[in-house]
C-alpha cells in the first residue's frame, strides 16, 4: 500500500486477504474509549492487563451490569479488541501473565474520531491554517529556487512534494473530517430541537433559540476563518504550479497541486453551503414556532391548556405572555419604491440617493486610494479609511458604506500579517461604538 492511489479491485482484494472486520457494540466501544482516555494520561503509553480489567469494571458499572466473573468477561473483551486489531498484546516467556498492551493505529483512529475530533473550534482551525500557510510558503520558495538552480527530481520530492503531501494534505483531510463531524453535530441538534418542540413549549422555545444561535455563530466563525485564508493559500499553490509547468518529470507535483486545490475548494464551498442550509432550517423552525398555535388542528395546545387549568391547584403555574414586534427589512435591495405623485419639494436632507450611486462614489474613492498606493507605495489602513468615509455620511448609511468599502478592499490586495495567524486589534470607526478588525493591506 505504498502507492498514492489504489483501484477498487486492489483495495477489495487487500481487505479480503487480511480478513478485516469490525464489530463494536456500545459496551465494547465505550471500553475502547475508556482505554484511550486512560492511555493518554500515561507517559509511556503502555498498559497492563490489570489496568484493562479495572477499566472494564468501571465501564460495566456505568451500564449497571453484573460484576460476576468480571475477570473472565474482561479477558473476553480484551481478546476481541486484540482480534480486531484495536489493541496490540506483547508478551514473552519471561513476562508470563504480565502482558503489555498498546493501542494500534486503528484503535487510536477510532477513539480519536469520538474524542479529539469533536474539539473543533475557530482557534484550532486558525492554528491549522497558519501551519498550512507556513508549509506552502516554504514549498513555494523551494520551488522557485529549484527553477533558478535547475535542481534534480530528488530536490523537488524532498523540498516541495514531501511537505505538501505529508503535511498540507493531511491537515486538509483533518479539516474535511472535522466538517463532516460538524454535519453530524448539526443533525443531532436538529433531533434535539425536534424533541424539545414535542415537550414543554415554554422551555422549548428558549432552548431552541439558544441551540440555533450557537450553531449559526459557530458555522459563521469557522467559515470566516476559512475565507480569510483560502484565497492566500490558493495563490501560493498557483505559484508552485507555475514553477512546474512544462516539466514532464515533475508531473507528480502538478497532480498533487490539483488535488490540493480541489480539496481546498471543496472545504470552503461546503462550509458556505452548510451555512446556507442551516439558515434555511433556522427560518423553518422559527416559522413553525410562529404558526404552530394557529395551525392547532388537533387541538393539542387547547387540550394542554384545559388540563393545566383543571390541575392548577395540584400543579400551580405562571402565565407568560409576549407580543413580538413586527420585523421590517429596511435593507431589501429588491424592494420596489412607490411611484406616487407628490406635491411640493423635499428638503435636501430627504432627497433620495440610490444605493448604486453611493456604491459608485465609494468605488471611485477606493480607486483613488489604489492609485496613490501604487504611486507612493503606501499601505492602506482599512480602519482609517472606514473612519474617514463614515464621517461624511449619516448614521443610517454607515452599514451600507462600510460593507461597500470592505468589499472593495478585499479586491485590492492582501496583508502579509494575515499569513502569520495573528488576529489584528479592534479599531473604532465611528462614535457609536462600531469597530473593525483588519490588518493593513500592504501587498497589492
From Swiss-Prot:
<keyword id="KW-0132">Cell division</keyword>
<keyword id="KW-0963">Cytoplasm</keyword>
<dbReference type="InterPro" id="IPR033439">
    <property type="entry name" value="MukF_WHTH"/>
</dbReference>
<comment type="function">
    <text>Involved in chromosome condensation, segregation and cell cycle progression. May participate in facilitating chromosome segregation by condensation DNA from both sides of a centrally located replisome during cell division. Not required for mini-F plasmid partitioning. Probably acts via its interaction with MukB and MukE. Overexpression results in anucleate cells. It has a calcium binding activity.</text>
</comment>
<dbReference type="GO" id="GO:0006260">
    <property type="term" value="P:DNA replication"/>
</dbReference>
<comment type="subunit">
    <text>Interacts, and probably forms a ternary complex, with MukE and MukB via its C-terminal region. The complex formation is stimulated by calcium or magnesium. It is required for an interaction between MukE and MukB.</text>
</comment>
<comment type="similarity">
    <text>Belongs to the MukF family.</text>
</comment>
<dbReference type="Pfam" id="PF03882">
    <property type="entry name" value="KicB"/>
</dbReference>
<dbReference type="GO" id="GO:0051301">
    <property type="term" value="P:cell division"/>
</dbReference>
<dbReference type="GO" id="GO:0030261">
    <property type="term" value="P:chromosome condensation"/>
</dbReference>
<dbReference type="GO" id="GO:0005509">
    <property type="term" value="F:calcium ion binding"/>
</dbReference>
<dbReference type="GO" id="GO:0007059">
    <property type="term" value="P:chromosome segregation"/>
</dbReference>
<dbReference type="InterPro" id="IPR033440">
    <property type="entry name" value="MukF_M"/>
</dbReference>
<dbReference type="Pfam" id="PF17192">
    <property type="entry name" value="MukF_M"/>
</dbReference>
<dbReference type="InterPro" id="IPR036141">
    <property type="entry name" value="MukF_M_sp"/>
</dbReference>
<keyword id="KW-0159">Chromosome partition</keyword>
<keyword id="KW-0226">DNA condensation</keyword>
<dbReference type="InterPro" id="IPR033441">
    <property type="entry name" value="MukF_C"/>
</dbReference>
<dbReference type="InterPro" id="IPR036388">
    <property type="entry name" value="WH-like_DNA-bd_sf"/>
</dbReference>
<dbReference type="GO" id="GO:0009295">
    <property type="term" value="C:nucleoid"/>
</dbReference>
<dbReference type="InterPro" id="IPR036390">
    <property type="entry name" value="WH_DNA-bd_sf"/>
</dbReference>
<protein>
    <recommendedName>
        <fullName>Chromosome partition protein MukF</fullName>
    </recommendedName>
</protein>
<dbReference type="InterPro" id="IPR038198">
    <property type="entry name" value="MukF_C_sf"/>
</dbReference>
<dbReference type="GO" id="GO:0005737">
    <property type="term" value="C:cytoplasm"/>
</dbReference>
<keyword id="KW-0131">Cell cycle</keyword>
<feature type="region of interest" description="Leucine-zipper">
    <location>
        <begin position="212"/>
        <end position="240"/>
    </location>
</feature>
<dbReference type="InterPro" id="IPR005582">
    <property type="entry name" value="Chromosome_partition_MukF"/>
</dbReference>
<keyword id="KW-0106">Calcium</keyword>
<dbReference type="Pfam" id="PF17193">
    <property type="entry name" value="MukF_C"/>
</dbReference>
Amino acid at each position: 500500500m505504498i502507492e498514492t492511489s489504489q483501484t477498487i479491485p486492489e483495495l477489495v482484494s487487500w481487505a479480503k486477504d487480511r480478513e478485516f472486520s469490525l464489530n463494536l457494540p456500545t459496551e465494547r466501544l465505550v471500553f475502547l474509549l475508556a482505554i484511550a482516555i486512560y492511555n493518554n494520561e500515561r507517559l509511556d503509553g503502555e498498559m497492563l492487563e490489570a489496568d484493562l480489567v479495572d477499566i472494564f469494571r468501571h465501564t460495566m458499572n456505568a451500564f449497571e451490569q453484573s460484576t460476576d466473573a468480571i475477570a473472565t468477561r474482561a479477558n473476553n473483551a480484551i481478546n476481541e479488541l486484540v482480534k480486531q486489531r484495536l489493541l496490540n498484546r506483547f508478551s514473552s516467556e519471561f513476562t508470563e501473565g504480565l502482558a503489555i498492551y498498546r493501542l494500534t493505529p486503528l484503535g487510536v483512529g477510532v477513539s480519536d474520531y469520538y474524542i479529539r475530533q469533536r474539539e473543533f473550534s475557530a482557534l484550532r482551525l486558525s492554528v491549522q491554517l497558519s501551519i498550512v500557510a507556513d508549509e506552502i510558503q516554504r514549498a513555494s520558495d523551494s520551488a522557485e529556487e529549484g527553477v533558478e538552480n535547475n535542481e534534480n527530481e530528488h530536490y523537488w520530492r524532498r523540498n516541495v512534494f514531501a511537505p505538501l503531501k505529508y503535511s498540507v494534505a493531511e491537515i486538509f483531510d483533518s479539516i474535511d473530517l472535522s466538517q463532516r463531524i460538524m454535519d453530524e453535530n448539526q443533525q443531532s441538534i436538529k433531533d434535539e430541537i425536534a424533541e424539545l418542540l414535542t415537550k414543554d413549549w415554554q422551555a422549548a422555545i428558549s432552548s431552541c433559540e439558544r441551540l440555533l444561535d450557537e450553531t449559526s455563530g459557530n458555522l459563521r466563525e469557522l467559515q470566516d476563518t476559512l475565507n480569510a485564508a483560502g484565497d492566500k493559500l490558493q495563490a501560493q499553490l498557483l505559484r508552485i504550479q507555475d514553477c512546474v509547468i512544462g516539466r514532464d518529470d515533475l508531473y507528480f507535483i502538478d497532480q498533487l497541486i490539483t488535488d490540493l486545490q480541489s480539496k481546498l475548494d471543496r472545504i470552503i464551498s461546503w462550509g458556505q453551503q452548510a451555512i446556507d442550509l442551516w439558515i434555511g432550517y433556522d427560518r423553518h423552525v422559527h416559522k413553525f414556532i410562529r404558526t404552530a398555535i394557529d395551525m392547532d388542528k388537533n387541538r393539542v395546545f387547547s387540550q394542554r391548556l384545559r388540563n393545566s387549568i383543571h390541575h392548577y391547584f395540584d400543579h400551580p403555574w405562571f402565565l407568560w405572555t409576549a407580543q413580538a414586534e413586527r420585523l421590517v427589512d429596511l435593507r431589501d435591495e429588491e424592494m420596489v419604491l412607490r411611484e406616487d405623485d407628490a406635491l411640493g419639494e423635499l428638503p435636501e436632507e430627504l432627497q433620495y440617493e440610490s444605493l448604486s450611486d453611493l456604491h459608485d462614489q465609494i468605488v471611485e474613492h477606493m480607486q483613488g486610494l489604489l492609485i496613490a498606493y501604487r504611486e507612493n507605495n503606501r499601505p492602506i489602513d482599512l480602519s482609517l479609511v472606514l473612519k474617514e468615509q463614515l464621517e461624511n455620511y449619516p448614521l443610517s448609511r454607515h452599514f451600507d458604506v462600510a460593507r461597500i468599502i470592505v468589499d472593495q478592499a478585499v479586491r485590492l490586495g492582501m496583508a502579509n500579517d494575515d499569513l502569520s495567524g495573528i488576529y489584528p486589534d479592534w479599531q473604532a470607526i465611528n462614535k457609536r461604538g462600531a469597530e473593525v478588525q483588519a490588518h493593513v493591506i500592504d501587498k497589492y
